[in-house]
A protein has these predicted regions:
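Short, Lys/Arg-enriched N-terminal segment that forms or immediately precedes the first helix
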Residues: 5-25
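C-terminal regulatory/oligomerization modules of transcriptional regulators
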Residues: 2-5, 104-162
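Short beta-strand "wing" residues that participate in macromolecule-binding interfaces
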Residues: 76
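Glycine-centered, phosphate/nucleic-acid-interacting loop/turn motifs that mediate DNA/RNA or nucleotide
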Residues: 72-73
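Basic, amphipathic "hinge/linker" alpha-helix immediately C-terminal to the N-terminal HTH DNA-binding motif
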Residues: 29, 81-103
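Acidic donor-binding segment of Leloir-type glycosyltransferases
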Residues: 69
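Short, hydrophobic-biased segments on the C-terminal half of alpha helices
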Residues: 65-66
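N-terminal helix-turn-helix DNA-binding core of bacterial DNA-binding proteins
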Residues: 19-60
Length: 162
């Protein structure tokens, strides 16, 4: 997939096309899409695994998987179990693995601002020591910043001034 996409599908307004958030939501903003990515990050690769975990209708799941493949988030691979027909499995690409930061931010936000009374259903841990980690904005000096110390400003491609 071209990483410098200028006209995302479904976005006709040039101002919207310039916005990274609009372009990203065009790919993963529909119901089920981020949940498919979540399950793929947890190791799911087969249609039946996604269907059973999510409870998504098969036609919608098929559409979302195809869209994520077309967008370069997932890669479709053929496999065949002995005595069965050929099927497809779905694997995260580099782009898809990059969404782990988004998923981590959603987990962290949910734990902080919308916690479940029964405790955490997911935790962010490092792969070696399995110690819990958190996401942060890091200043070039290496210092972690609070959300009050970070703001969103127009970039060079923006046509608006805030």
């Amino acid at each position: 997939m071209n990483s410098t996409k200028t006209e995302p599908a479904g976005v006709s307004d040039d101002t919207e096309a310039r916005c990274q958030i609009v372009r990203t939501l065009d790919i993963v903003g529909e119901k089920w899409s981020l949940l498919i990515v979540r399950d793929a990050l947890r190791g799911s690769t087969r249609f039946s695994e996604f269907r059973d975990s999510l409870g998504a209708p098969s036609d919608i799941l098929t559409t979302r998987l195809a869209k994520l493949v077309d967008a370069g988030v997932l890669e479709k691979r053929a496999y065949r179990e002995p005595g069965s027909r050929e099927r497809s499995s779905y694997h995260l690409t580099e782009s898809g693995r990059g969404l782990s930061l988004v998923m981590g931010a959603l987990v962290q936000w949910g734990d902080t601002y919308n916690p479940y009374s029964g405790g955490k259903s997911s935790k962010l841990v490092d792969t070696e020591g399995h110690e819990e980690v958190s996401l942060a904005f890091i200043h070039p000096s290496g210092r972690a910043l609070t959300t009050e110390e970070v703001t969103l400003v127009p970039g060079p491609a923006s046509r608006i001034r805030w």
